[in-house]
Design a protein with these regions (language model features):
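Structural helix-adjacent loops and short alpha-helical linkers that scaffold large soluble proteins
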Residues: 132-144, 188-195, 243-246
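Hydrophobic alpha-helical hairpins/lids featuring a short glycine-rich hinge
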Residues: 101-158
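Terminal-appendage/accessory-domain detector
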Residues: 1-115, 218-228, 235-478
Length: 478
């Protein structure tokens, strides 16, 4: 799909007037639970579980705490749960805090072709509204499916140009529309009002990827800003405040504003019959998804060739063009957690020296000031280069070739697809195991299990409020 995704200027001109904003709004407003295929419903629940686990594991971090404290200070009391607090806030403020946490440690989901994170904005947005209006499970599943799909479809329209050519961050640019569509469906907005809300949401679309060049914590906040922006846009639209109903496809709409190359029709092609978010990847490692294939190839060399740090003269990572831009800049000496997670050099060195790339490994690296001599020594021996096979496969497939020159004069290499993607998917048991490790380590097994049961119960039309209710019960780590 992606090879034909990018349109010429002539083709864009011919298709840009298709009213995809209104088509999307109409579809979202009218979709019924019975029309959502069983495999779609099941995937919604697993992605929701994974996202809540990601938010819980990040909830104790300093920078997440600062955002939560800001929300608690600014918001009046409400009905929406704030992860990490016993207070409940207005939906937009709870979503700001929870979405920032959900995107807070690079363990949330991602999509190869759309190059997007579909879960971290719709899940907190939809659940915050669901708590406020006491929504049931089936309508919540529909809303989440629409939020996920909106983000992925947006990515299919504008990626990879939006990030590679313009440097915009997909989570905030696309996420605000996923928030608006998902929560707007839950609120029962008619097509005209929802289209207007999308027009307003565009004014919240923002965020660059400069964090991948020089670090900073702002990337985490992009999910929160998108969630809040989507909900605020809905509130204004419901009061009659209008936005342009051609905001996606228009001559001065968001597609042309954020991308050099885009395809308007991808937003609505076969909508309802084909759900592109089904191929969303769930991360096994706590770092940028572009690095995962690099890690998998290196892990194969460790397991199959007995590779050790002392063996290494040089590590050459053959990869795709976007990785050369997005995870190749920071190098061997990251300044903070975010930059470590966007450094292929440092993350691969952690794999070889520390034995893994879980959240706990990055916390340990942070405790050492990201300057552990053994890790830095290996990181300085790593370089990235363009690999023809990886380039040809990208973005449908995340592929990497890792070649290691050893001190004994030999060279070994492995090629791997990224674990967690459709090429090497995690099983349902592995996804649930990941959630239980993340959530159980923060709130205890009893609370984590109660949340998991409540998410599964959405399929039986249980109240959506039950999903985060265990956190409000004051359960402590067990």
């Amino acid at each position: 799909m992606a090879k034909g995704m990018m349109a010429s200027t002539e083709a864009r001109t011919q298709t840009q007037q298709r009213p995809v904003t209104r088509e999307l709004a109409s579809f979202a407003s009218k979709l019924r639970y019975e029309e959502v295929q069983p495999e779609v419903r099941k995937r919604v629940l697993l992605l929701t579980l994974d996202q809540i686990g990601a938010a819980l594991v990040a909830s104790t971090l300093d920078y997440i705490t600062r955002v939560r404290e800001y929300a608690l200070e600014e918001s009046p009391d409400g009905l929406s749960t704030v992860i990490g607090s016993q207070r409940k806030l207005r939906p937009e403020w709870a979503a700001l805090s929870n979405a920032t946490a959900g995107h807070g440690v690079e363990t949330d989901d991602y999509h190869n072709i759309a190059l997007a994170h579909p879960g971290c904005v719709p899940v907190p947005s939809v659940l915050a509204v669901a708590e406020q209006i006491d929504a049931r499970g089936h309508e919540t599943i529909v809303a989440l499916a629409l939020g996920f799909e909106t983000i992925i479809r947006f990515g299919l329209c504008v990626m990879p140009s939006m990030i590679k050519d313009r440097g915009f961050h997909e989570t905030c640019v696309m996420g605000v529309f996923g928030s608006a569509v998902g929560a707007g469906r839950l609120l029962g907005l008619d097509p005209e009002t929802l289209a207007s809300a999308l027009g307003l949401a565009a004014s919240h679309a923002s965020g660059t990827t400069e964090y991948a060049e020089s670090g900073g914590e702002v990337k985490r906040l992009h999910a929160g800003l998108a969630a809040m922006g989507g909900l605020r846009s809905l509130s204004l639209a419901r009061r009659g405040f209008r936005g342009p109903p051609t905001i996606l496809e228009g001559r001065r709409g968001v597609f042309q504003a954020f991308s050099d190359e885009y395809r308007v029709d991808a937003m609505v092609e076969d909508l309802g019959n084909r759900w592109d978010f089904l191929t969303t990847a769930i991360k096994p490692y706590c770092c940028c998804g572009l690095i995962h294939a690099h890690i998998d190839a290196l892990r194969a060399l460790m397991a199959e060739e007995g590779l050790r740090p002392d063996d290494v003269l040089e590590i050459i990572v053959g990869t795709d063009p976007l990785s050369l831009v997005h995870v190749n800049r920071i190098g061997a000496r990251p300044a903070d957690m975010n930059s470590a997670q966007f450094s292929s050099h440092f993350s691969l060195a952690m794999t070889l020296v520390m034995g893994g790339n879980d959240f706990a490994h990055y916390v340990a690296a942070q405790s050492a000031g990201f300057s552990d001599p053994a890790v830095v020594r290996i990181a300085e021996k790593i370089r990235l280069e363009l690999d023809p096979e990886a380039e040809a496969a990208f973005p449908e497939h995340f592929l990497a070739r890792v070649r290691v020159k050893r001190r004994d004069g030999s060279t070994i290499e492995r090629t791997r697809y990224a674990t967690g993607t459709p090429d090497a998917p995690l099983t349902e048991a592995e996804i649930r195991g990941k959630y239980r490790r993340m959530a159980g380590g923060i709130v205890g097994d009893a609370t984590a299990n109660a949340i998991e049961r409540a998410i599964d119960a959405l399929a039986d039309d249980a109240p959506a409020r039950d999903v985060l209710r265990p956190l409000s019960a004051g359960a402590r780590r067990s």
